[in-house]
UniProtKB/Swiss-Prot annotation:
A motif ('KMSKS' region) lies at residues 627-631. It is found in: Cytoplasm. One of its GO terms (molecular function) is leucine-tRNA ligase activity. ATP binds at residue 630. It comes from the Bacteria. PROSITE patterns: AA_TRNA_LIGASE_I. GO terms for biological process: leucyl-tRNA aminoacylation. This is Leucine--tRNA ligase. Its main location: cytoplasm. The gene is leuS.
């Protein structure tokens, strides 16, 4: 064994061995337990960041541990390669997105390999390659024919300068991020998945996922947003509206119906359109509403504005005339684009009514009383007994719900209804770098799916977009085609799919990535699925994880998979955070400096109290810890860390610094500490191996000191097995290894028996570290005399007999205060323990002259003498 620990050489040798032996290539082995461990695949942005390193290290530790339990483990990797960043980079660098993407993939793949991940690279998928998205198009055509995908007009953010649709996050203060033009809302035809058809199942089957964090399940439940309420119809006032009809609203609070004082409609509602005729001010307000963001989150925070119309509707139960307002907070795509407003019991309506001096009528007795003041109180929204509601007075929420429903049914003006917040998933994107939608528009036949023998519809890769709409719409060579049904001249769809579609089924494709007869080989898919452990950030809690669950059910209903859910267990890893430093610039902005360029001063408790820039020695402001990001310039390049310390040190630090689901604070001293620890392990093993390997340990001949050492080894094995296997607490498992290392370093090495015990200890340390620091473990295992590589070794088994103690130390308290300790045989009786405690020299001093009232013995732990 080399005297020095040289990570670069050790890691290169281990990785070469794994490549040569194809150590991570996996095939189906019927009868052997399978384990599918998957980390969310990366977007090929150019370089790995520390968040990636953490995510993939966590997955790799779990995968390697499960392999050591004897399971057939699948851990694949791929690239979520379509998307806007490639288009933006292409425009900036005047290069085709395909070229930029493939170059990034090549570089990032070498980075991932340098981490020593146990990945089966033969299963790699790249979502922008036709051999992948062809099956997405195939499924699209199947679902279109079944009606699960349909086309309808949708409201989008339209940039009139660039002539393109913008995502909500590309609209900044009402203007296009690139052009600066004022954004308009437009209706354009788009394709939608009927995810609402699966809303009930998506909600109910969350209960089948005990291995998911409650927080994520709650977020999905809220997003799906199932609510039982009432559909209420307000008859048109014919004198003001001019014709018969009813205004439909949906409310979850029908008990407050008698408190409705006005109704509000969305800018797109037919009544708004009618009211604006001959009313330029109202028309201008409607146009303003339509130009706002279409994001629900923005709606929630924006100022509530409205304008009255001359129209009236009738209260369905009292016949009272209620004014119709147009309001910017009413969404056309939720409910029926209209709300009944009860200002006394809804905060939004309350704000609006106070702003525009509309009546407020309390109809529920709340904990705040019967009256409603001029300032909103949370209590006003409570359920309670009805007041000021005529025949319904005195009823509680449930009673009022039923009674008001019965009254509305009698008048044929309402009924109870279940509604979902979840909307159908619009997947059309007016972008170039995405999967082409496989539809042909024929003047005679309408929308015709591309036949299977003409798939894939291939995206031309040699295109440099200019940002002004989709280049596909300006490429006749792409869109000119003939109708598959009638043969007439037709036009190919030029929209591409939302990139969330690719990431909604990739986990299934890994089971048979080269299968060319279908989206998946059902036999292989059902062998591996569902994924046993999925790892990724909490930011994907809703969209990606919901869409993947939805797609899995679509694949099940197509007969491609048999399971109901894609991911059995979910681990949402925390962020990687680091200190930030800045100076305020002359324009009032902030110039951020990388921590590597800053010299810091700490107090006695290691808190940062001052910082200076290394280049000029002048102070910089301390901004606190934040998520590593380019904008705050507080990122650490993983590549430089791997080159300086080795992948094992980086992996060890990442796993030791924090539990996986908590934020991890980057610390250079922590990385140094991890490196120091691995050098200690190497030094101890090297000294041991260089003396020659010992013979077998004679368990029957162990002396007391050796028994204590062996107990420490097996205590570490037992605790680490629980920490890693049950709780993914890698940090406490590593702490166990550090504890046993302290014991082994002090252990005697004078006899053959001592050295055989040290051999057992070093083997345990190597095996416990193997999933976390696989390269050094590969080398140590070989040096400790094993022909079989550590990658094929089993997780260490605890010897329960080693944990049995001949003697135990008990603390002795007098009236609850520690006064001494006694060492007793493990099998000592209660009487023997009590006698020893009473006769302890120090205890005698504290009970002298007192009467002993009671002696409490907690076996194996303590004795408490109660005396006065």
């Amino acid at each position: 064994m080399h005297e020095q620990y040289t990570p670069r050489d050790i890691e290169a040798a281990a990785q070469h061995f794994w490549d040569e032996q194809q150590s991570f290539a996996v095939t189906e082995q019927p009868g052997k337990d399978t384990y599918y461990c998957l980390s969310m695949f990366p977007y090929p942005s150019g370089k790995l960041h520390m968040g990636h390193v953490r995510n993939y290290t966590i997955g790799d530790v779990i995968a390697r541990y499960q392999r050591m339990l004897g399971k057939n483990v699948l851990q694949p990797m791929g690239w979520d390669a379509f998307g806007m960043p490639a288009e933006n980079a292409a425009m900036k660098n005047n290069v085709a997105p395909a070229k930029w993407t493939y170059e990034n993939i090549d570089y990032m793949k070498t980075q991932l390999k340098s981490l020593g991940l146990a990945i089966d690279w033969a299963r790699e998928v790249t979502t922008c390659k036709p051999d992948y998205y062809r099956w997405e198009q195939w499924l699209f055509t199947r679902l279109f024919e079944k009606g699960i995908i349909y086309r309808k007009n949708g409201t989008v953010n339209w940039d009139p300068a660039d002539q393109t649709v913008l995502a909500n996050e590309q609209v900044i203060d009402g203007r296009g991020w690139r052009s600066g033009a004022l954004i308009e809302k437009r209706e354009i035809p788009m394709y939608y998945f009927r995810i609402t058809d699966y809303a009930d199942e998506l909600l109910e089957s969350l209960d089948e996922l005990p291995g998911w964090p409650e927080q994520v399940k709650t977020m999905q439940r809220n997003w799906i947003g199932k609510s039982r309420g009432m559909e209420v119809q307000f008859p048109y006032d014919q004198a003001s509206i001019g014709h018969e009809g009813t205004l439909k609203v949906f409310t979850t609070r029908p008990d407050t119906l008698m408190g409705a004082t006005y109704v509000a409609v969305a800018a797109e509602h037919p009544l708004a359109t009618q009211a604006a005729q001959g009313n330029p001010a109202l028309q201008a307000f409607i146009d303003e509403c339509k130009s706002g963001s279409v994001a629900e989150a923005d709606m929630a925070t924006q100022e509530k504005k409205g304008m009255p119309t001359s129209l009236l509707v009738e209260h369905p139960l009292t016949g009272e005339k209620l004014p119709v307002w147009v309001a910017n907070y009413v969404l056309m795509h939720y409910g029926d684009g209209a709300v009944m407003a009860v200002p006394a019991h809804d905060e939004r309506d309350f704000e609006f009514a106070h702003k525009y001096n509309l009546p407020v009528k309390a109809v529920v007795r709340t904990s705040a009383g019967d009256e409603v003041g001029s300032e909103w109180q949370a209590a006003y929204g409570e359920h309670g007994q009805l007041i000021n509601s005529g025949e319904f007075d005195g009823l509680d929420f449930a009673g009022a719900f039923d009674a008001i429903e019965a009254a509305l049914i009698r008048k044929e003006l309402g009924k109870s209804r279940t509604q979902f917040r979840l909307r159908d998933w619009g997947i059309s994107r007016q972008r170039y770098w995405g999967c082409p939608i496989p539809i042909i528009h024929c003047p005679s036949c309408g929308d015709v799916p591309v036949p299977e023998d003409q798939l894939p519809v291939t995206l031309p890769e040699n295109v440099v977009p200019d940002g002004a709409g989709s280049p596909l719409a300006r490429m006749p060579e792409f869109y000119e085609c003939s109708c598959p049904k009638c043969g007439a001249a037709a036009k190919r769809e030029t929209d591409t799919m939302d990139t969330f579609v690719e990431s909604s089924w990739y986990f299934a494709r890994y089971a048979s990535p080269n299968y060319d007869k279908g989206l998946v080989d059902p036999k292989a898919a059902n062998h591996w699925l569902p994924v046993d452990q999925y790892i990724g950030g909490i930011e994907h809690a809703i969209l990606h994880l919901l869409y993947a669950r939805f797609f899995h059910k679509l694949m099940r209903d197509e007969g491609l998979v048999t399971s109901n859910e894609p991911f059995k267990n979910l681990l949402t890893q925390g962020m990687v955070v680091a200190e930030t430093y800045y100076r305020v610039a002359s324009n009032g902005g902030k110039d951020w400096f990388n921590p590597a360029d800053v010299e810091i001063e700490r107090d006695a408790k290691a808190k940062i109290i001052g910082a200076r820039l290394k280049t000029d020695g002048l102070p910089v402001e301390i901004g606190g810890t934040e998520k590593m990001s380019k904008s705050k310039n507080n990122g650490v390049d993983p590549q430089s860390m791997i080159e300086a310390y080795g992948a094992d040190t980086c992996r060890l630090f990442m796993m030791f610094a924090s539990p996986p689901d908590m934020s991890l604070e980057w610390s250079d001293s922590g990385v140094e500490g991890a490196s120091r620890f691995l050098r200690r392990v190497w030094r101890l093993a090297q000294g041991h191996v260089n003396q020659g390997l010992p013979g077998k340990l004679d368990l029957a001949a162990l002396n007391d000191e050796q028994k204590v050492i062996r107990r420490a080894i097996h205590t570490a094995i037992k605790q680490a097995s629980t920490d890693v296997g049950q709780y993914h607490k890698f940090n406490t498992a590593i702490a166990q290894v550090m504890t046993v290392m302290n014991v082994l370093e002090k252990a005697p090495q004078s006899t053959e028996q001592d050295r055989a015990l040290l051999q057992e200890g070093l083997e345990a340390v190597t095996l416990l570290l193997a999933p976390i620091t696989p390269h050094i473990s590969h080398e140590l295992w070989k040096a400790l005399g094993h022909e079989q590589a550590v990658i094929d070794a089993c997780w260490p088994v605890v010897d329960e007999s080693a944990l049995v103690q001949d003697t135990v130390t008990l603390v002795v308290q007098v009236n609850g205060k520690l006064r001494g300790q006694v060492e007793m045989p493990a099998a000592a009786s209660r009487e023997e323990i009590e006698a020893a405690a009473r006769n302890n020299e120090n205890v005698l001093r504290f009970i002298d002259g007192l009467t002993i009232r009671k002696v409490i013995v907690v076996p194996g732990k303590l004795v408490n003498i109660v005396a006065n």
